[in-house]
Amino acid sequence: MDVRQSIHSAHAKTLDTQGLRNEFLVEEVFVADEYTMVYSHIDRIIVGGIMPITKTVSVGGEVGKQLGVSHFLERRELGVINIGGAGTITVDGQCYEIGHRDALYVGKGAKEVVFASIDTATPAKFYYNCAPAHTTYPTKKVTPDEVSPVTLGDNLTSNRRTINKYFVPDVLETCQLSMGLTELAPGNLWNTMPCHTHERRMEVYFYFNMDDDACVFHMMGQPQETRHIVMHNEQAVISPSWSIHSGVGTKAYTFIWGMVGENQVFDDMDHVAVKDLR
């Protein structure tokens, strides 16, 4: 488990390129036949990936020991979105078939979660966010047909994108975790511009569906102290509440966003005008 400490905005603005990457970038999300796990002190979110190929991968008691509990989800909820081939997730003996861009919410208290791919030639890639939970909501599969899509932006401003809301109150109940998938239209490069912060939530972006020769310049920092981190395919970045979170790519891309914090009101944002950015 890779543990990341919280960081003050006054400290963050003094960091060089490698310093920013060390604090906020999750460089390797998927490793064959393993789970990756980054634990952030910011709202206690855990992010990572699971790519089973030649064997199943389980997340159980060994992680619980690191968290001071008997098993991983004893006091946590889990959200998973599959960006790879078809797979299965078995929760305490109940098997769910999770296809490409299907998702699974796992409620607090589940003791054993086992991940598998159906075809080793096209393995599943399970990206997950995990957050502290105060009560148990039912485990539920969510398909792309069930999400709440919203299309925003314009081709003229190169930010035409569709936001697919997987884990939001309109789709299912969670304690605090919200997740979704945003896909840019072909030829569009910007996400979340004009940008915003949200004092009451933190967020993690996971960029994927990118060519090897492409990258995204992920914008971060306070609106008057902006910085950037260069992101490549299948990498994630942690965004504290005080930071903007926006990006511009060399080509169109897709990203998964996950939020935890005070509320689940999607539009609870502190908007920043482009003219006010520095």
UniProtKB/Swiss-Prot annotation:
Catalytic reaction(s) noted: 5-dehydro-4-deoxy-D-glucuronate = 3-deoxy-D-glycero-2,5-hexodiulosonate
Required co-factors: Zn(2+)
Catalytic class of the enzyme: isomerase
SUPFAM superfamilies from the UniProt entry: RmlC-like cupins
Binding site for Zn(2+): H196, H198, E203, H245
Enzyme Commission (EC) number: 5.3.1.17
Cofactor binding: number and manner: Binds 1 zinc ion per subunit.
Stored Pfam families: KduI
CDD domains referenced in this protein's UniProt entry, alphabetically: cupin_KduI_C, cupin_KduI_N
Oligomer status and interactors: Homohexamer.
Its job: Catalyzes the isomerization of 5-dehydro-4-deoxy-D-glucuronate to 3-deoxy-D-glycero-2,5-hexodiulosonate.
Family: Belongs to the KduI family.
Name assigned to this protein: 4-deoxy-L-threo-5-hexosulose-uronate ketol-isomerase
Species per Swiss-Prot/TrEMBL record: Escherichia coli O8 (strain IAI1)
